[in-house]
């Protein structure tokens, strides 16, 4: 009998999860189509998607693919030579890059997996949303219906769409959604049965994965692990076991960080700029982001401070309506069922406290509503500590998800008092989803059209140019002589990666690599002295420097000079 119940319980989870995944895939195809799924087509990356970050992520992967295997596994000695760097600092999703590096012997020179990974993120987000929404309803039919609708709703969260492709690693929001599900389900099992569920061991797994996908997701997963430990201690009085659970998640994150290089790689983290990329107080209702998209068919874009585009947390009109309805229902419940509300707060105050703290961190000490605001002075040591996560607006992702879950649970809970609760909850949730889809329909069309145009328009830049094609033959490195233009930096790194070359270009976003800067200066000095390495391809974005090279090496017939996309090259024809 017990085995039958367990099988039935698994079935009730699996079916909504599969339907949620299908909903997530459908949303991806609606928004982007199939264009980004072509692994050999990287023109859209070479054009840049909303900004240049995706070029950095792609360059990090390509150069890492050419790197020697070493420890940590995410170390790329082909970037920022001579010391190299870890690809956690190029935001190239270390675990995914490591997996594909194992296949490098059979992969073509141009190979981008960002489309398929993002499709997976939508599927997993739909799965997590389905599990979160379906856990509060009985019966496999109702779970399936709510799972499908809930999965689609979570796949239609604007924060997922905004990060997808612009900053692919940050589309992995399924990490903290699954962590939230594990926490809530484990707490429920412990409360109902008194047994500590095995499901909780997924929290260390998620912590391990998070640190090797993007470090910003680690605090959000660890918050869920901490909430579970607190509630385990509160419910069972087993504070030793609770501490062990949290320590296990922390240890898993540490091991993962050491393996991929996010922790202990010897590169100092940037600690400046806390508050620069914070969340504006109007973020939940502000459909304003990079790319100038029309995120809402009803609401207008509101002003932001410079840098607060990264604190984008617009919820979508459907979720906003859901929250307003849930708030009204909660106020009514406060007066009609005060004891039930008191019990709810007793059960959930740790979650509310965690969300409040994350919100404060996301807003930062630069507190603004639009253009009106003030700055709270903080000691420098605290600013430096918070600066490790300087893009603080991302920390609101978990509170936003908690708000959406609370709205769904409140709506479904209210429907239980009606004559046909299953039909009522399904219809209302479908209406919420319909409003959300309607509100986001314009931005969906804009993003779909962007990829359609990218497919139709040919691209020619330094990373995809007839003059630079094949320069890796017989050469080992692409060396910049001095600093290069920022708008060519990542494209040159992509070129090096495609051609199988290492480079002294530094494309990492955190920390300092003084050795690579010195190498670029030494390279310039070497050429000025009349010497060069025949195995190197030299590049500058300063035409006057390139003309000097031609004068210095005027009698050397082994060298050739050419220009591609405002980048000036010198290389040995027969190295």
Identify what each model region corresponds to:
Residues 1-42, 244-249, 331-354:
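Start-transfer (signal-anchor) and selected internal transmembrane alpha helices
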Residues 27-124, 157, 167, 171, ...:
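Membrane-interface coil-to-helix junctions
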């Amino acid at each position: 009998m017990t085995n039958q119940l367990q099988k039935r319980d698994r079935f009730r989870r699996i079916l909504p999860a599969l339907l949620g995944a299908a909903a997530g895939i459908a949303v991806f195809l609606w928004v982007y189509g199939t264009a980004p799924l072509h692994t050999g087509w990287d023109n859209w990356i070479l054009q840049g998607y909303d900004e240049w970050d995706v070029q950095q992520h792609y360059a990090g992967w390509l150069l890492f693919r050419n790197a020697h295997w070493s420890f940590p596994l995410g170390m790329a000695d082909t970037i920022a030579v001579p010391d190299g760097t870890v690809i956690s600092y190029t935001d190239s999703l270390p675990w995914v890059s490591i997996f594909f590096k194992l296949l490098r012997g059979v992969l073509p020179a141009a190979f981008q997996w960002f489309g398929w990974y993002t499709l997976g993120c939508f599927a997993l987000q739909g799965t997590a949303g389905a599990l979160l929404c379906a856990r509060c309803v009985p019966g496999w039919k109702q779970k399936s219906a709510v799972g499908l609708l809930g999965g689609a709703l979570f796949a239609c969260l604007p924060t997922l769409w905004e990060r997808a492709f612009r900053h692919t690693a940050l589309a992995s929001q399924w990490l903290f959604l699954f962590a939230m599900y594990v926490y809530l389900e484990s707490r429920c099992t412990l409360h109902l049965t008194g047994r500590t569920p095995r499901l909780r061991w997924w929290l260390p797994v998620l912590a391990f994965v998070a640190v090797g996908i993007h470090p910003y997701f680690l605090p959000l997963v660890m918050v869920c692990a901490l909430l579970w430990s607190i509630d385990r201690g509160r419910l069972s009085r087993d504070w030793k076991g609770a501490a062990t659970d949290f320590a296990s998640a922390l240890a898993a994150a540490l091991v993962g960080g050491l393996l991929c290089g996010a922790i202990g790689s010897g590169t100092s983290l940037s600690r400046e700029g806390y508050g620069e990329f914070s969340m504006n107080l109007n973020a939940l209702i502000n459909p304003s982001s990079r790319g100038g998209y029309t995120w809402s068919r009803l609401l207008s874009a509101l002003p932001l401070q410079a840098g607060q585009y990264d604190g984008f947390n617009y919820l979508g009109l459907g979720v906003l309506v859901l929250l307003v309805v849930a708030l009204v229902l909660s106020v009514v419940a406060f007066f009609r069922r005060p004891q039930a509300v008191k019990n709810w707060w007793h059960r959930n105050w740790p979650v509310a406290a965690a969300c409040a703290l994350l919100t404060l961190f996301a807003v930062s000490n630069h507190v603004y509503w639009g253009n009106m605001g003030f700055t709270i002075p903080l000691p420098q040591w605290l600013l430096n500590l918070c600066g490790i996560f300087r893009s603080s607006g991302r920390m609101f992702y978990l509170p936003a998800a908690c708000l959406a879950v609370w709205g769904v649970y409140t709506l479904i809970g209210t429907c239980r008092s009606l004559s046909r609760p299953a039909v009522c909850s399904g219809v209302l949730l479908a209406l919420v989803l319909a409003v959300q889809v309607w509100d986001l329909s314009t931005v969906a069309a804009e993003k779909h059209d962007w990829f359609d145009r990218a497919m139709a328009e040919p691209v020619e830049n330094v990373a995809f140019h007839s003059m630079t094609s094949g320069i890796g033959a017989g050469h080992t490195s692409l060396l910049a002589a001095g600093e290069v233009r920022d708008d060519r930096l990542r494209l040159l790194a992509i070129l090096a990666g495609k051609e199988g070359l290492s480079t002294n270009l530094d494309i990492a976003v955190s920390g300092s690599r003084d050795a690579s800067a010195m190498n670029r200066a030494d390279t310039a000095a070497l050429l000025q002295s009349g010497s060069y390495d025949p195995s190197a391809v030299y590049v500058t974005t300063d035409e006057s420097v390139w003309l000097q090279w031609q004068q210095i090496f005027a009698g050397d017939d082994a060298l050739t000079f050419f220009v591609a996309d405002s980048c000036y090259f010198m290389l040995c024809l027969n190295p």
